[in-house]
UniProtKB/Swiss-Prot annotation:
One Pfam family hit: Flu_M1
Function: Plays critical roles in virus replication, from virus entry and uncoating to assembly and budding of the virus particle. M1 binding to ribonucleocapsids (RNPs) in nucleus seems to inhibit viral transcription. Interaction of viral NEP with M1-RNP is thought to promote nuclear export of the complex, which is targeted to the virion assembly site at the apical plasma membrane in polarized epithelial cells. Interactions with NA and HA may bring M1, a non-raft-associated protein, into lipid rafts. Forms a continuous shell on the inner side of the lipid bilayer in virion, where it binds the RNP. Determines the virion's shape: spherical or filamentous. Clinical isolates of influenza are characterized by the presence of significant proportion of filamentous virions, whereas after multiple passage on eggs or cell culture, virions have only spherical morphology. Filamentous virions are thought to be important to infect neighboring cells, and spherical virions more suited to spread through aerosol between hosts organisms.
Gene designation: M
UniProt signal peptide: none
Note: Most abundant protein in virion. When expressed alone can form virus-like particles in transfected cells.
Region (Membrane-binding): 1-162
Homology family: Belongs to the influenza viruses Matrix protein M1 family.
Organism: Influenza A virus (strain A/Teal/China/2978.1/2002 H5N1 genotype W)
Name of protein: Matrix protein 1
Subunit structure: Homodimer and homomultimer. Interacts with NEP. Binds ribonucleocapsid by both interacting with genomic RNA and NP protein. May interact with HA and NA. Cannot bind NP without genomic RNA.
Principal subcellular localization: virion
Its membrane topology: Multi-pass membrane protein
UniProt keyword terms in alphabetical order: Host nucleus, Membrane, RNA-binding, Viral matrix protein, Virion
Superkingdom in the source lineage: Viruses
Length: 250
């Protein structure tokens, strides 16, 4: 699930060194390595380039994921970004959506319901939850986040959304890069102390650097297909020699 969230969130961030940095922050947060929400929010608030809405979405994701003290202040820059441009229509729709989301229990169910709403209504609904005016499960909140990112990526891509399958090249591209990073991580964990460990680390390292480079300079969405295939091929070859089954990484 977190891989999916990372994919969607990163698909709305313009390529550049900042995108690579945000990818790292998300990975750390999801892995439980970064637990200082105050510092994270302060860092996010001062980032250049990002639109207020993108900052709002990231702030919402960090707040959902990082455990924090109950009384921690909500941040104004996130609240302002998630107020649906102050449009009362967005607020009305957000309340309707919130009532539907309360009935959902799965990430995909929530995402599906949310996709039929406008970005403004989705942002307002996140605002409701962020301001503790309503509560949903984390999984449902992530569904809402991903639906919002898909709407934004779609409008960036100007493509027509199809509900059932992700056809947006930006999201597919980001997904391949996230998968490549995840696979690299898995290779390093498997490497252990065997004599092939150095080789596994090398392959994983190359993959990391490529993903980092692709995020930093930005590439055509089609170029990432090869990256993942190469990585999986290397992984398969390495696992064959190690006598390990490929099952886990399909």
């Amino acid at each position: 699930l977190l891989t999916e969230v990372e994919t969607y969130v990163l698909s709305i961030i313009p390529s550049g060194p900042l995108k690579a940095e945000i990818a790292q922050k998300l990975e750390d947060v999801f892995a439980g390595k970064n637990t200082d929400l105050e510092a994270l929010m302060e860092w996010l608030k001062t980032r250049p380039i990002l639109s207020p809405l993108t900052k709002g979405i990231l702030g919402f994701v960090f707040t959902l994921t990082v455990p924090s003290e109950r009384g921690l202040q909500r941040r104004r820059f996130v609240q302002n970004a998630l107020n649906g441009n102050g449009d009362p229509n967005n607020m009305d729709r957000a309340v309707k959506l919130y009532k539907k989301l309360k009935r959902e229990i799965t990430f995909h169910g929530a995402k599906e319901v949310a996709l039929s709403y406008s970005t403004g209504a989705l942002a307002s609904c996140m605002g409701l939850i962020y301001n503790r005016m309503g509560t949903v499960t984390t999984e449902v909140a992530f569904g809402l986040v991903c639906a919002t990112c898909e709407q934004i990526a779609d409008s960036q891509h100007r493509s027509h959304r199809q509900m059932a399958t992700i056809t947006n090249p930006l999201i597919r591209h980001e997904n391949r890069m996230v998968l490549a990073s995840t696979t690299a991580k898995a290779m390093e964990q498997m490497a252990g102390s065997s004599e092939q460990a150095a080789e596994a680390m090398e392959v994983a390292n190359q993959a990391r650097q490529m993903v980092q480079a692709m995020r930093t300079i930005g590439t055509h969405p089609n170029s990432s297909a090869g990256l993942r295939d190469n990585l999986l091929e290397n992984l398969q070859a390495y696992q064959k020699r190690m006598g390990v089954q490929m099952q886990r990484f399909k």
